[in-house]
Amino acid sequence: MAVNLQIPSESEILPVAGVEIGVAEAGIRKAGRRDLTVFRLAPGSAVAGVFTRNRFRAAPVQVCEAHLAQGGPIRALVVNTGNANAGTGAPGLKNAQDTCAALGKLLDVPAEQILPFSTGVILEPLPMDRLTAGLPAAVADLRADGWYGAAHGIMTTDTLPKIHSRRVDIGGKTVTITGISKGAGMIRPNMATMLGFLATDAGIAQPLLRQLAIELADVSFNRITVDGDTSTNDSFILIATGQAGVTVDSAGDAAYAALRDALAAAATDLAQKIVRDAEGATKFMTIRVEEAGNTEEALKVAYAVAHSPLVKTAFFASDPNLGRILAAIGYAGIDDLDVSRLRLWLGDVLVAVDGGRNPDYQEADGQRVMKQAEILVRIALGRGQVADTVYTCDFSHEYVTINADYRS
């Protein structure tokens, strides 16, 4: 039921020099499904990550953060689906560490140079026997063109793989950017289960890469929401292999802006693909708040509207009960909001002006917009010059069915 989700063909996915990927069936999620993915990175690759702010952080998130904090090289990633290894306490932490150790032996790299990722059911022990038994097959499958298989291998309730690939000219040289993401529910990243892996063959200095990962997550994965739930496992990883002959050492370098913009476009596309494939989604909604006093209040309003079950179900039904949007704006937490200055558009239709119904608004016009698969909700607060945008979807009967049946 994905909403206008465009998936490139396997032949359109560009390998990133310095990245090899292998996928295997380990039987962690269900029999006959690829559920274990390994990335091997060339020596000299730089890696940075942004992780969930949920206080109930999954074991692999804790291990990733610890390994990155050591400041050494990262040579491999390992991702399992079907089990989140979250809410598993000390045994879960040991399982994440043991996963790194097992892969390290196969690749002949130290365990602390490996980052583990898990996605799936929370509060269940990771089946280490199946995971470790599947690692040799994933390693044997390592190849430069493994992105398409990996996009399938990290899926849980996703209906389609999420992949982005492009080439850009940076400083007269060709740079490749390819990434994958997964997530369909429990999506309100705050740095769904949301995982994102984005790689480039450009070289980026490690301190700059860390800052860039934060900035990219903030304009992409931190601007989407499906159901308002922030996962225990949200992770976004940015990889720069340095194989393209282009190196950026500081934000002042001439090549930086073009590289940053290309990476931001890729990250935004991967994030929006998650919303387009959200559990049961039939509508893709852009909530844009303008004339805010600052970014914080713009996002407060945008998320209040995007998270409202009443708003989301109204969009599913194509029911222009748009007072629900005004109500959400009102409880967004801006105490000194002057509603008499507020304006609201649904697509190109002005619904509310000066805090009340536009005298020229006709419900048939609102319904015409709400029947569309992609809808823009634009809100002007009349408080300043700041604008920001959040992407979300509707709530359908299928969303309830998927989550009610998730463990069946």
From Swiss-Prot:
A GO cellular component annotation here is: cytoplasm
Q: Which family does it belong to?
A: Belongs to the ArgJ family.
Q: What is its main location?
A: cytoplasm
What does it catalyze? N(2)-acetyl-L-ornithine + L-glutamate = N-acetyl-L-glutamate + L-ornithine; L-glutamate + acetyl-CoA = N-acetyl-L-glutamate + CoA + H(+)
Organism encoding this protein: Bordetella parapertussis (strain 12822 / ATCC BAA-587 / NCTC 13253)
* Signal peptide segment: none
Q: In which pathway does it act?
A: Amino-acid biosynthesis; L-arginine biosynthesis; L-ornithine and N-acetyl-L-glutamate from L-glutamate and N(2)-acetyl-L-ornithine (cyclic): step 1/1; Amino-acid biosynthesis; L-arginine biosynthesis; N(2)-acetyl-L-ornithine from L-glutamate: step 1/4
The job of this chain, per UniProt, is described as: Catalyzes two activities which are involved in the cyclic version of arginine biosynthesis: the synthesis of N-acetylglutamate from glutamate and acetyl-CoA as the acetyl donor, and of ornithine by transacetylation between N(2)-acetylornithine and glutamate.
Q: Where in the cell is it found?
A: Cytoplasm
Its lineage opens with: Bacteria, Pseudomonadati, Pseudomonadota, Betaproteobacteria, Burkholderiales
Under Enzyme Commission nomenclature, its number is 2.3.1.35, 2.3.1.1
Name used for this protein in its record = Arginine biosynthesis bifunctional protein ArgJ
Q: Does the keyword Amino-acid biosynthesis apply?
A: yes
Instruction: State the InterPro entries in the record.
Output: Arg_biosynth_ArgJ (IPR002813), ArgJ-like_dom_sf (IPR016117), ArgJ_beta_C (IPR042195)
Binding locations of substrate? 156, 182, 193, 279, 403, 408
Q: List the Gene3D superfamilies.
A: arginine biosynthesis bifunctional protein suprefamily (3.30.2330.10), ArgJ beta chain, C-terminal domain (3.10.20.340), L-amino peptidase D-ALA esterase/amidase (3.60.70.12)
* Cleavage (site feature) positions: 192-193
The entry's keywords: Acyltransferase, Amino-acid biosynthesis, Arginine biosynthesis, Autocatalytic cleavage, Cytoplasm, Multifunctional enzyme, Transferase
Uppermost EC category: transferase
Q: How does it assemble?
A: Heterotetramer of two alpha and two beta chains.
What residues make up the catalytic site? 193 (nucleophile)
Give the transmembrane region(s).
Answer: none
